[in-house]
């Protein structure tokens, strides 16, 4: 909303409260000192610097935190963002539906874009990096960035876009993808996928054991940003061991007494 009062222009937006004394030419941010107005969809932390991170905010672009300062480096709705594990000056970020991909090689000082492939992406299109810095994305299928072009690796996993995609940090040939209530696994770098485990409810996130890849952690619920009446009834947190032959072991329910009225998201760091 925009309102004039005492010759000042007040702006109330998803990003906060701003005031202009020159008719809208410049604005002063009145929410900069401690008023929390942003909601992160995703964050990623640099592997070698826990103080450096990137993240996508609903309606408030993509941010990078570097040298204890937050700065905007993309526009639109910030979605899935990643820091390159081999060089933390290289950062990536998706806006809505995964189009385009924002790329910066100097910690957000300058930014380029790469258009999405022909495949359809979710509102939050998953972005994943291998330990070697290879970039993957989940649209209707799994794609890998080759220079400035997306290369399609897999067939469609199902009838809808991929909900989450992760690369095993211990083995870049192992990828996990979630679509609906099913987790798929690839052992050949994302070319072929087989069914790994089926859950009773839709999957919101996957995280992989960072030590040895011996297990994945799965959360079931709709994603952050969905209204309460759109959330699924069956929500939980689960551990699924990964056997040496790539099969899923017995699922362990870790939900315990977590509240059932929230969306869940798993991070292993």
Model segments located where?
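Beta-propeller blade termini and top-face loops
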Residues: 1-269
